[in-house]
UniProtKB/Swiss-Prot annotation:
Residues 5-121 form the RCK N-terminal domain. The uptake system is composed of KtrA and KtrB. GO terms for cellular component: plasma membrane. GO terms for biological process: potassium ion transport. Its main location: membrane. It comes from Vibrio alginolyticus. Belongs to the KtrA potassium transport family. This is Ktr system potassium uptake protein A.
């Protein structure tokens, strides 16, 4: 393992879990894929660092896998709600730093929140929000709900904003909103100089409360 490589574990290898594994692995991270289904584990073994058949609703299994050594653990167990909740509880009690969990509905999400899940994803709901935001504003290229009312969005600079600076947009004056960076061509500039003059086609990446982001984008 290279120093500085992030380590992720994904528990549950349905379509969602496998997609998460592949994206994380392609980004250069170290990925452990876990499922009770041997066929799914074999599929994941073709592209992740390590794939194991195991049941993470057992405390001994979680201890043996040393999940507390991982930067993040994603619990992507789909159909079995009880297994998802139990795996989350065991992971938190084992000292896992950051537990992300896929939830099927708001009731499950509330239960997961109460037992300590650090981040809850509801894929169908989140995709619906993303699509709606992009339909409402064609400048929005990506809209990612992050949970707890927060979202990250990427929007493109058009003719109305050309020649203005990042400071002129006053994004950071909106409570809770931060500019993470912007993209010009292939280059991504993190922590950008707010005096940067914008050009048509620049992508601006911001994070903040969903409602405040939406209202601010309408005003630009």
């Amino acid at each position: 393992m290279k120093t500085g490589d992030k380590q992720f574990a994904v528990i549950g290898l349905g379509r969602f879990g496998l997609a998460v594994c592949k994206e994380l692995q392609d980004s250069g991270s170290q990925v452990l894929a876990v499922d009770i289904n041997e066929d799914r584990v074999k599929e994941a073994a073709g592209f992740v660092s390590q794939a194991i058949v195991a049941n993470c609703t057992h405390e001994e299994t979680v201890a043996e896998l040393k999940l507390d050594d991982y930067d993040m653990v994603m619990i992507a167990i789909g159909a079995d709600v009880n297994a998802s909740i139990l795996a989350t509880l065991i992971a938190k009690e084992a000292g896992v730093k950051s537990v992300w969990v896929k939830a099927n509905d708001r009731f499950q999400a509330r239960v997961l929140q109460k037992i300590g899940a650090d981040h809850i994803i509801m894929p169908e709901r989140d995709m619906g929000i993303r699509v709606a935001r992009k339909m409402l504003d064609k400048r929005v290229l990506e809209f990612h709900p992050l949970g707890s009312g927060l979202a990250m969005t990427e929007f493109v600079v058009g003719s109305r904003l050309m020649g203005k600076t990042l400071s002129d947009l006053a994004l950071c004056k909106v409570e809770g909103v931060q500019v993470l960076g912007y993209k010009r061509g292939p280059e991504i500039i993190k922590a950008p100089d707010m005096s940067t003059t914008l050009e048509i086609g620049d992508l601006i990446i911001v994070v903040g409360p969903q409602d405040k982001l939406a209202n601010k984008l309408k005003s630009l």
